[in-house]
Amino acid sequence: MALAFDEYGRPFIILREQEKKSRLQGLDAHKANIAAAKAIARILRTSLGPKGMDKMLQSPDGDVTITNDGATILELMDVDNQIAKLLVELSRSQDYDIGDGTTGVVVMAGALLEQAEKLLERGIHPIRVAEGYEMASRIAVDHLESISTKYEFSATDIEPLVQTCMTTLSSKIVSRCKRALAEISVKAVLAVADLERKDVNLDLIKVEGKVGGKLEDTELVEGIIVDKDMSHPQMPKRIYDAHIAILTCPFEPPKPKTKHKVDIDTVEKFQTLRGQEQKYFDEMVQKCKDVGATLVICQWGFDDEANHLLMQRELPAVRWVGGVELELIAIATGGRIVPRFQELSTEKLGKAGLVREKSFGTTKDRMLYIEKCANSKAVTIFIRGGNKMMIEETKRSIHDALCVARNLIINNSIVYGGGSAEISCSIAVEAAADRHPGVEQYAIRAFADALDAIPLALAENSGLPPIDTLTVVKSQHVKENNSRCGIDCNDVGTNDMKEQNVFETLIGKQQQILLATQVVKMILKIDDVITPSEY
């Protein structure tokens, strides 16, 4: 406990707990918060665009991840600072809602805070800056709506969807196969989409991977792939016109629910018990045969004796299948999951045209393909790759492509990429600033400057002089009144993004601006940071 005096000479007591806390107030607090956010944005800035760099992250367990997906980088970074954690949440929110644009949203938030710092140093109140940013974000979102284009597609004409997915995949490691992967992603989304209701359930798309083969071997399977094999090596490897019993109950004689003890003191009693168990299991197998099942898929295991009996009775079985996979199998085959064995009936069986076991390479790895299902609304994207890291990164890339295709089905408006949308918004926001006579005018201009961070980063990452490139494109926007001009990252020779087929979804771009502004406003309103000091 310590004694201190205020400005009037009155004594007051400082408790030991308060002595242990460090405190930042006013402009110092704002600067510390902005510095933390800028540090995170600086890390992600080099990963933006088709020429963006990848990051290698090592977990405490020694697992290595190589990725340029913003949400994944931030998820795996061990961030202590609370403001940095806000940006991690921001990226996760963009990933959850839109699936793409996770790097851009953090870069934009960092640029907005960098501009805000200059205004705060000039003595402008943070609330006025936040209000100016809110006005500017509304102007930018409305402008995006005005420059957007409706992109018509159908179940037969999927080229618009493929082109948009290719834009997403062009910044990933898998960009050399972007055409094939984009087509696979679009076909998978259309298989599970309800185009009339504009509804897509991505849970019906299973993404599975296996080390071996090359990326070009990635395929779309109209059915389900399960990383299991038949329970007995002598069971048939192909079953045509399969009737599948899907069990979540144990495929074995029932055990008493209460504590019990069985006294066996003679060989006869043991043989009676064994015979009873065998008889019970025999009846279970017979019931499966009677209802017409030609394949049993079980969530639980069964012992070797039961397995041998199944093989003898010519009833193929698969054991230890996960709950999520069982659900997908039930949806695909039109079957019902059976929780109690007594409820098994012919109506609850799933139907598939072909169930086959496929082996890979010289290893003993086998997987089960369930194809030609009664209901084709569940599909699997099966990824091949040279190593585990490649497969994991491909899964993340395909997730982004699936989300983009879904967003385009929900709302088929697109804006042009390559930084063209941000440059156009920057010009529109700058022009609108003059219509606001208050201090907010400075914040609106700062917002316009912050929007330039995306095209500047794209140019920088592509090895172009950033400021020179941006000024040329901006003047072209104004002279030609052409909102499609962006940064020519791939050195094609034209900066018209329509000719380069670089598209982004309107809702994704709007969400980026709104989420970044929202988080920046929250950070600007923090003027006091109290943290426990280090021991």
UniProtKB/Swiss-Prot annotation:
Gene Ontology MF, one: ATP binding
Keywords of this entry: ATP-binding, Chaperone, Cytoplasm, Nucleotide-binding
Record's subcellular location: Cytoplasm
TM helices/strands, residue ranges: none
InterPro entries: Chap_CCT_epsi (IPR012718), Chaperone_TCP-1 (IPR017998), Chaperonin_TCP-1_CS (IPR002194), Cpn60/GroEL/TCP-1 (IPR002423), GroEL-like_apical_dom_sf (IPR027409), GROEL-like_equatorial_sf (IPR027413), TCP-1-like_intermed_sf (IPR027410), TCP-1_chaperonin (IPR053374)
Cystine pairs: none
Domain of life: Eukaryota
CDD domains: TCP1_epsilon
Main location: cytoplasm
Gene3D superfamilies per UniProt: GroEL, GroEL-like equatorial domain, TCP-1-like chaperonin intermediate domain
A cellular component annotation (GO) from this entry: chaperonin-containing T-complex
Protein family membership: Belongs to the TCP-1 chaperonin family.
The protein's role, per its UniProt record: Molecular chaperone; assists the folding of proteins upon ATP hydrolysis. Known to play a role, in vitro, in the folding of actin and tubulin.
Subunit and interaction comment: Heterooligomeric complex of about 850 to 900 kDa that forms two stacked rings, 12 to 16 nm in diameter.
Protein name as it appears in the record: T-complex protein 1 subunit epsilon
Organism, as annotated: Avena sativa (Oat)
